[in-house]
Amino acid sequence: MAEVPPGPSSLLPPPAPPAPAAVEPRCPFPAGAALACCSEDEEDDEEHEGGGSRSPAGGESATVAAKGHPCLRCPQPPQEQQQLNGLISPELRHLRAAASLKSKVLSVAEVAATTATPDGGPRATATKGAGVHSGERPPHSLSSNARTAVPSPVEAAAASDPAAARNGLAEGTEQEEEEEDEQVRLLSSSLTADCSLRSPSGREVEPGEDRTIRYVRYESELQMPDIMRLITKDLSEPYSIYTYRYFIHNWPQLCFLAMVGEECVGAIVCKLDMHKKMFRRGYIAMLAVDSKYRRNGIGTNLVKKAIYAMVEGDCDEVVLETEITNKSALKLYENLGFVRDKRLFRYYLNGVDALRLKLWLR
């Protein structure tokens, strides 16, 4: 078998073994010094990037000088300090590009979410690291010493608010949720007030029952029992049915009832005639409101309706008598403009004094 002649590579002398790292002195300059420590691979990359145009006169001597200088030969630093003086090693270039691309994608997503908000306000999107806990470092990430790019606004928000980064929500979403909760509470309170099962006086109300207070004029004799029931229960002295018929049959337009559903809860009975043949005087004979519906303005509204009806009848003044001890009735009439005209001693059958109140219309 013929012997293969040795190739040209076999004629070259074997490469000298590299000197042990322990013998070489460590670089005395810090990471931010003016002289940069580069590996042989980086020098080869720079030669290729420069197009191979290396000076034949000074290139080799510079390499020899660099190799022979004790401070320019430094051991390879650890992985977390690959970037020195703004230079990035080839092993970290793809990581730098990935981080830059990720920040651009997050910025575009934030702008799209803000423009998609219907009310024009800023709307937060999922922040960086939504699926990674705040204490963990995502894969292929640079250390704090090797990171030179300016963080995006979304990353800054996530870094400043760990709870937002942990939940994937920013402060804007929390504010919107609080506003929605406030609107729900206001709506529920309004619905509760409208759909309450209690009347304004505190009485239980059946579901579906109409609790609106209606004011109607006297219409027929069928309403007489309700009027008598209210007035007999509240007034200080009883009246016969003839007294009711005298007022109601002669001045039915001056008799008003307050109705809640089909129940009569208030009534007022008045008259209007000539006084001393000089002027027309109106007289409020009876006013009563069911005790369960008091303090709802029913008595005031009944008196107002009666006075308006008297004004239509060309009334000059309105008078009435009430017990001097009935503070609520005195307050009601005085709030409507009545004044105390005269005190009538032992006016009622129970011996209580009365006050005559008067309202001048002209």
Curated annotation (Swiss-Prot):
Cytoplasm is among the record's keywords: yes
Record InterPro entries: Acyl_CoA_acyltransferase (IPR016181), GNAT_dom (IPR000182), NAA30-like (IPR044542)
Modified residues (Phosphothreonine): T117
Start-end of Low complexity biased regions: 149-165
Modified sites of kind N6-acetyllysine: K233
Keywords: Acetylation, Acyltransferase, Cytoplasm, Nucleus, Phosphoprotein, Transferase
Annotated compartments: Cytoplasm; Nucleus
Keyword Ion transport: no
Biased composition (Acidic residues): 39-48, 173-182
Molecular function per GO: protein N-terminal-methionine acetyltransferase activity; protein-N-terminal amino-acid acetyltransferase activity
Span list, region Disordered: 1-26, 38-88, 113-182
Catalytic activities: N-terminal L-methionyl-L-leucyl-[protein] + acetyl-CoA = N-terminal N(alpha)-acetyl-L-methionyl-L-leucyl-[protein] + CoA + H(+); N-terminal L-methionyl-L-isoleucyl-[protein] + acetyl-CoA = N-terminal N(alpha)-acetyl-L-methionyl-L-isoleucyl-[protein] + CoA + H(+); N-terminal L-methionyl-L-phenylalanyl-[protein] + acetyl-CoA = N-terminal N(alpha)-acetyl-L-methionyl-L-phenylalanyl-[protein] + CoA + H(+); N-terminal L-methionyl-L-tryptophyl-[protein] + acetyl-CoA = N-terminal N(alpha)-acetyl-L-methionyl-L-tryptophyl-[protein] + CoA + H(+)
Modified residues (Phosphoserine): S39, S55, S152, S190, S196, S199
Family from the record: Belongs to the acetyltransferase family. MAK3 subfamily.
Subunit details: Component of the N-terminal acetyltransferase C (NatC) complex, which is composed of NAA35, NAA38 and NAA30.
Protein name as annotated: N-alpha-acetyltransferase 30
